[in-house]
Amino acid sequence: MPRGSNEVIVIMWRDIPAQVNAQAGRERKQVQLSDKFQRAIDRAKRKAHIYTADEDIAQWRRISLPLVGDLAEAAQREADRLDSEYSRERLGRLAFAGGYEADVDNTAISADALLALEELEENE
């Protein structure tokens, strides 16, 4: 979809969601995802040996979805969907695989390594 259209945009680092934006014309709404997503991204960057800004910037992408209904509600609905769809274990596996969903099944991860991913839990 062209920028400036009515859409919900999911900002991704590789295959890990980072943020949800919605826009209708000039009106915009931004929803920050929970901290577990940022912690998974940080861990995936370390696993993938991404240390420079240039390397990091090349990994970001956006997914455009049609805007259905109210701007704020649509953004929050997508953020809630992502939060429920990406469990701590799924994010941990993604982080361990360097952020690529396609590599998750090919990456052997032990139960101990999964337990070490408790840092992805939110402290609420």
What are these regions (language model features)?
Residues 1-28:
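Short, charged/polar N-terminal "headpieces" of proteins
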Residues 7, 40-48, 75, 93:
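Charged, low-complexity, helix-prone segments enriched in Lys/Glu/Asp/Gln
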Residues 76-124:
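C-terminal charged interaction modules
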